[in-house]
């Protein structure tokens, strides 16, 4: 049974109903509909913390989805799961792949910056300030891109950029 039929969450049910109506009204191929079903089931599993199931659904959605914009969100969500699992190198790879298909994903730039900042903090703890600065500089570049796409968002990042004199 598809996950969308067993989820008891009101918001998920509402989303599923609206999505099903749109899939009937908007002209789409059966492959696109199936890809969206896997994507929707992946989001549902991810929201419940069932990352293995979410990844299976996302990979299947990637196999079926042909639209680069839609693929960018699938890749972004795969990156989120890898971030949650502490697999930062894999997460960065998926965020990069998402941005290749959709360069207007500020949340991907933000998440990449957070990972780089975290790695900078780790380098400081290991006593390597030179490596830390390189990671912080990379974080700054990603945050600048996120802020440029959505001015007024990422206030903490904006403040960090100012405090560390990395904001131009």
Swiss-Prot record:
Keyword Plastid appears in the UniProt entry: yes
UniProt keyword terms in alphabetical order: Chloroplast, Membrane, Photosynthesis, Plastid, Repeat, Thylakoid, TPR repeat
Pfam families for the chain: TPR_1 (PF00515)
Membrane topology type: Peripheral membrane protein
Domain of life assignment: Eukaryota
The keyword Plastid is annotated on this UniProt entry: yes
UniProt subcellular location: Plastid, Chloroplast thylakoid membrane
TPR repeats: 35-68, 72-105, 120-153
Knockout or disruption consequences: Non-photosynthetic phenotype due to the absence of photosystem I (PSI). Can grow only in vitro on sterile sucrose-containing medium. Under normal light conditions, mutant plants show severe pigment deficiency and leaf bleaching due to the accumulation of photooxidative damage. Under low light conditions, mutant plants show a light-green phenotype, very slow growth and delayed development.
GO biological process, one term: photosystem I assembly
SMART domains: TPR
Main location (coarse class): plastid
GO cellular component entries: chloroplast thylakoid membrane
HAMAP family per the UniProt record, alphabetical: Ycf3
Its biological purpose: Essential for the assembly of the photosystem I (PSI) complex. May act as a chaperone-like factor to guide the assembly of the PSI subunits.
Oligomer and partners: Interacts with Y3IP1.
Stored NCBIfam families: PRK02603.1 (NF002725)
Family recorded in the similarity comment: Belongs to the Ycf3 family.
Name of the protein in its database record: Photosystem I assembly protein Ycf3
Organism: Nicotiana tabacum
């Amino acid at each position: 049974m598809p996950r969308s039929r067993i989820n008891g969450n009101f918001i998920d049910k509402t989303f599923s109903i609206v999505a099903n109506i749109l899939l009937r009204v908007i002209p789409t191929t059966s492959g696109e509909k199936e890809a969206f079903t896997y994507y929707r089931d992946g989001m549902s599993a991810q929201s419940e913390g069932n990352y293995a199931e979410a990844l299976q659904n996302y990979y299947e959605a990637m196999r079926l989805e042909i639209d680069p914009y839609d693929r960018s969100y699938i890749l972004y969500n795969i990156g989120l799961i890898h971030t949650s699992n502490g697999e930062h190198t894999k997460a960065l790879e998926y965020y990069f792949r998402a941005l290749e298909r959709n360069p207007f994903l500020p949340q991907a730039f933000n998440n990449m910056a957070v990972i780089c900042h975290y790695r900078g903090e780790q380098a400081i703890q290991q006593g390597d300030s030179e490596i830390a600065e390189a990671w912080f500089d990379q974080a700054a570049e990603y945050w600048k891109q996120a802020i440029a796409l959505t001015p007024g968002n990422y206030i903490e990042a904006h403040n960090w950029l100012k405090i560390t004199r990395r904001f131009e």
